[in-house]
Amino acid sequence: MDSPTLEDRENSIEDCDDDDDNIYINEETEEGHEKVLVTHAPQERIVPPLNFCPVERYLYRSGQPSPVNFPFLLNLNLKTIVWLANEEPQDSLLEFCDTHKINLQFAAINPDAGEDDNPWDGLTEHSIINVLQTIVTKENYPLLVCCGMGRHRTGTVIGCLRRIMGWNLASVSEEYRRFTGSRGGRILVELLIEAFDTALVEIDKKNAPDWLLTSLE
């Protein structure tokens, strides 16, 4: 299965419509495309987090959000943020989640790591499964998966999700490397994704997102 293009994203915003003196956008809703009048520019800058990208409908990925990104995140109406690290995120993100009643889930990379271990390296199979169980449950949506830079740890989890969805390894690898920058991907990450046993993730079809059910048909 090839990687979908940006035009395929269900939650995309369509081109501007300038058929009169007003400015509109055609915004997709559950009932179809609804024309929304834009009356004024936003009062705050709308800046997405580093490496932000929609993954599927109401599922997003990024690096660690900072205060400049919070107005953007509010527009997503997030219910859950999954943090992929042993250490806590910045205090500003903790306060943001607390203020706006967003469930912040800590997915420790290695819960048994000692003080001398590098908290930025690798993901355990157990932690990946825990995150994926959150992702395949629609009651946690809208949902953001993030790590420090939004590259390797987030890429590992999303890569394993794509395996569940039936993507071929070439497409999974291409998506992972799209976010790794000039330094390129890590072969160990790609090997982990390839070896991941997708059967370890339990999917309740009554509580799974629609896009996941479609991919499993």
UniProtKB/Swiss-Prot annotation:
The active site is at residue 147. It catalyses: O-phospho-L-tyrosyl-[protein] + H2O = L-tyrosyl-[protein] + phosphate. GO terms for biological process: cellular response to oxidative stress. InterPro entries: Prot-tyrosine_phosphatase-like, Siw14-like, TYR_PHOSPHATASE_DUAL_dom. It is found in: Cytoplasm. It holds the Pfam family Y_phosphatase2. Gene3D superfamilies: Protein tyrosine phosphatase superfamily (3.90.190.10). PANTHER family: TYROSINE-PROTEIN PHOSPHATASE, TYROSINE-PROTEIN PHOSPHATASE OCA1-RELATED. Belongs to the protein-tyrosine phosphatase family. This is Putative tyrosine-protein phosphatase OCA1.
